[in-house]
Amino acid sequence: MFLDSFLHKKFFSTIEKKSLLPSKSSLLVAFSGGQDSLTLVKLLYDLNPFYRWRITLIHFDHRWRWDSMLASKQVFSFARYYNFPLYYFECPDYLNTEEASRKWRYTTLIDLAVKNNFTKILLAHTATDSSETLLSNLFRGTSLDGLASIGWSCQLAQSVYIVRPLLNFYRFETSWFCRKYYLPIWVDRSNYDYIMFRNRLRQELVPYIKSYFQPNLEERCYSLSSLVKYDTDFLEQEALRIYFILIHQDLIAINHTALRLLHLSVQSRIFKIFFIANLNFNPNSRQIEDVIIFIKQNILSQINMNNYILVMDDIWFYVGVKIIKFS
């Protein structure tokens, strides 16, 4: 029987209630060999006789550690044992930062999914990951969006969705699951490098808070981020609805006289949508604040934003020309 543990039941209940993984879906599963991804793949394998998914694994080797090839060999052995097809990608040498590597991983996932007709890209993010992200963003300084939980599912491209079916799982649960089923966890030594902010948070700060302040810290953080997500989703939808009412029909412009009447929270979100949609530019909070102050002063003038001239007349705030710099 495929529901032979409480985590099997939890996983089955989650994907059914949220309709995350319909029967016969084509799944591309990011597989690192760590305990979270091992748990996800094992659960998919056990439930597959019921759902009949087409499951394929993908592994990214960043070659940042001397033992990364050994980790990859273990991933290959696991995939072979469970008879899963596996894609293997080595990170290019020039991608030497976490952010650049992250963009490369997501680009590769999307391209591969589109070319091979995968409808779901699965990531083994857990509630523990979500709580660590919340704390990390809080310490670094963030907006309300930075406190919101990552979504269960979101659309990346036409007919391709990214799905995180373990978002209500905790790391102690995936650790127990791997021990129960003798799954070969590959221990990433870099997770214990305290030079990295997130590792110190995970290994030192979180255990300290759980010991002396809040033993259910991860659950509390997950609950908070989930509640914040409801509010931010509503604000985003409301901002998008108003954005389409206020934009010019022909020009890259927005009605600033009507915009000024809105709450500052909605104004900032509308401007963010405006810049991303028209200029492919994601402004930071300081830049958005500068624009809001500019239109509030109601001076018929212009400002420079990311090498674009932004102009304001009696009614419209619009994009003028792009500044081209010659070296």
Curated annotation (Swiss-Prot):
The N-terminal region contains the highly conserved SGGXDS motif, predicted to be a P-loop motif involved in ATP binding. ATP binds at S32, G33, G34, Q35, D36, S37. GO terms for biological process: tRNA modification. HAMAP family: tRNA_Ile_lys_synt. Its EC number is 6.3.4.19. Pfam families: ATP_bind_3. It comes from the Eukaryota. GO terms for cellular component: chloroplast. It catalyses: cytidine(34) in tRNA(Ile2) + L-lysine + ATP = lysidine(34) in tRNA(Ile2) + AMP + diphosphate + H(+). GO terms for molecular function: ATP binding; tRNA(Ile)-lysidine synthase activity. Keywords: ATP-binding, Chloroplast, Ligase, Nucleotide-binding, Plastid, tRNA processing. The keyword Cell membrane does not apply. The keyword ATP-binding applies. InterPro entries: Rossmann-like_a/b/a_fold, TilS/TtcA_N, tRNA_Ile_lys_synt, tRNA_Ile_lys_synt_N. Ligates lysine onto the cytidine present at position 34 of the AUA codon-specific tRNA(Ile) that contains the anticodon CAU, in an ATP-dependent manner. Cytidine is converted to lysidine, thus changing the amino acid specificity of the tRNA from methionine to isoleucine. This is tRNA(Ile)-lysidine synthase, chloroplastic. It is found in: Plastid, Chloroplast. Belongs to the tRNA(Ile)-lysidine synthase family.
